[in-house]
Amino acid sequence: MKEEKSEKESKVKKKISKIIGTITVACVLMMTAGCGIMGMGSKSWIEKQVSDIEKVYPTENPEDLFEKFPNGFRIEQMRLFEENGKSYSISLEMKGDKETRKIEGKVSRVRLESKPYKETVEKESKVEYIKDKGLVLAKSELTDELLPKNYFLFQKLKLNTNALKKLEVKDKSFSFETGKYNIKYLFINKEIDNYLELNKQKVSLDIIGRYTEKNKIYFHSVIIEKATELYFSEKVVEEKGK
């Protein structure tokens, strides 16, 4: 009986040892994988993700984007401002068509109301980028109201890894769920001053992108803010190939 009991105990101990061994290996694997994941979201990791922003910033001739993005691209801009105590946005949406090689879209001036939230398009026009002329409205009489500038910010603003590393970082974030990341810098820039009609004022420049392992495309938004007085965003997105 004692021998039988001892044999059973030995078998139980062996099973427990195997279970413990399996758990230990799993923990080691998880820790190893975790070390790789932990780098995601760090300042250096985010800076690496945004390093290809120099692919667009600057691009003096927007038509050159067709060479960089053969499947076409989208350009979006948004300005928020107040006028006579009312809130407005100027929204620009354009598409670089790979077939026609044209960059066309529309620009709208929209009245914004909060209670309840409501958007009212007050003025709108088709817009096209024409080389040597810049952004040209179909309704030229609305140019002053719909086009504060007749060119894109990315035509003038230079952003690259070396330049960004010299800037003060205000904030950064990364979402494991969505893959969305952003890094926010504080600085004064002549091209931004000229584009947004500022006077050597420090602004925050927020670069936003989305990380994915598959079907990687260029996707960056640049958001410029100054307290509550200024909000401007410009987004360039590469179209996916079929």
Task: Identify what each model region corresponds to.
Residues 31-82:
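N-terminal leader/targeting segments and the immediate start of mature chains
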Residues 90-98, 205-212:
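Extended lipid/amphipathic-ligand handling interfaces
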Residues 93-148:
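An acidic-aromatic
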Residues 159-211:
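Extended beta-strand-rich segments in extracellular/periplasmic secretory proteins, especially
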